[in-house]
Amino acid sequence: MSHPEAPITPEVEADLAIARRGCDELLVESEFARKLACSRATGVPLRIKLGLDPTAPDIHLGHTVVLNKMRQLQDLGHNVIFLIGDFTSTIGDPSGRNSTRPPLTREQIETNAKTYYAQASLVLDPARTEIRYNSEWCDPLGARGMIQLASRYTVARMMEREDFTRRFKGGVPIAVHEFLYPLLQGYDSVALKADLELGGTDQKFNLLVGRELQKEYGQEQQCILTMPLLVGTDGVEKMSKSKGNYIGISEAPESMFGKLMSISDTLMWRYYELLSFRSLADIAALKAEIDGGRNPRDAKVALAQEIVARFHSPQAAEAALAAFEARFRDGAIPEDMPEVTVGGAPQGILRILREAGLVASGSEAQRNVEQGGVRVNGDRVEDKSLQLSAGTYVVQVGKRKFARVKLVG
């Protein structure tokens, strides 16, 4: 839709502040302010698009960073479009890849898509969310339509993309079909007449292609808003199921609570900024209390309870806290436990115990496991061959020995 000039009122400034919170970039901010102003003046909501490819059946907290932003804009009264990339998933997004991504079959995509929206609905308001599948307009394109779409973008522009440039210079093959992915994602914005598209920072190139294609098709260009990629529980790499540093939103309350309690105090504040629904003023006040001497554990408990309550219930959050505290009732978790980094993930529990200095020998490690004296994130280890993937873990031997172990690949 076309957005004529309208005054930038204090209400518009407040809306803009909500959009800016935690975002990496808002392009072009002046254009988006104009769109917001026109929407308030006319009462016509903006069309806000978020596309996700159902490449895996589960959504983790990293995905919810952009979903949270979508919900904030939804609560301002705008129309949000949750786009499931069932067609583009058959190509595979090359964003951030050092090699060609294996495409999924339609059967895999359909299986994953069934759970995607159900999980996303834990963040978005289902009654006010439009669900679309990009096969609606991509399937009918056919060969002629695909060639016509490809004619609207140049190879030179496509090679401006950092991961394509890196692979080309490194002699790593780039398949022609990978050039089609950003074009099709951009064409989604044309089909939906999007006013704003959301995505992670790794999606910036694709989102900008959407702007360019809308211009090519005679539409007003969408603005783009990118959100940071959430660092996983290991505090090093972005949250990813393949890295083992993720927290799934459908995980059991106790598991979710325990993983959140295992993150570092520094990372906790980033999680507050990107995952909490508390105001920035409330978070700043809480941080000031911690800086003034209050136990950081209190802030971490509050964060864990908020997130567990959101995806389960307040009662489940209380029960998860009680279970967590019960695990350590006989031996309190020390304020400043030693932190150890162990390489070679995935790694066996016996070696981890030795590397962390919790035992003096392999035989001692094995004996402690066999006697039920070893816990990881509060759960008793019963298998001496247990392998832990990359992530951060609170490892306990007996009642008094603790270490925060960061396991890296």
Curated annotation (Swiss-Prot):
EC top class named in words: ligase
Annotated EC: 6.1.1.1
Gene Ontology terms describing biological process: tyrosyl-tRNA aminoacylation
CDD domains per UniProt: S4 (cd00165), TyrRS_core (cd00805)
Domain S4 RNA-binding: 347-407
Chain location of the short sequence motif 'HIGH' region per the record: 54-63
Motif ('KMSKS' region): 238-242
Keywords annotated in UniProt: Aminoacyl-tRNA synthetase, ATP-binding, Cytoplasm, Ligase, Nucleotide-binding, Protein biosynthesis, RNA-binding
InterPro entries associated with the record: aa-tRNA-synth_I_CS, aa-tRNA-synth_Ic, Rossmann-like_a/b/a_fold, S4_RNA-bd, S4_RNA-bd_sf, SYY-like_C, Tyr-tRNA-ligase, Tyr-tRNA-ligase_bac-type
One Pfam family recorded for the sequence: SYY_C-terminal
Major localization class: cytoplasm
Catalysed transformations (reactions): tRNA(Tyr) + L-tyrosine + ATP = L-tyrosyl-tRNA(Tyr) + AMP + diphosphate + H(+)
Compartments where located: Cytoplasm
GO molecular function annotation: ATP binding; RNA binding; tyrosine-tRNA ligase activity
Binding-site list for ATP: 241
Taxonomy, superkingdom: Bacteria
Similarity comment: Belongs to the class-I aminoacyl-tRNA synthetase family. TyrS type 2 subfamily.
Subunit-level organization: Homodimer.
HAMAP family named among the record's database cross-references: Tyr_tRNA_synth_type2
Record function comment: Catalyzes the attachment of tyrosine to tRNA(Tyr) in a two-step reaction: tyrosine is first activated by ATP to form Tyr-AMP and then transferred to the acceptor end of tRNA(Tyr).
Protein's UniProt name: Tyrosine--tRNA ligase
Species annotation: Bordetella bronchiseptica (strain ATCC BAA-588 / NCTC 13252 / RB50)
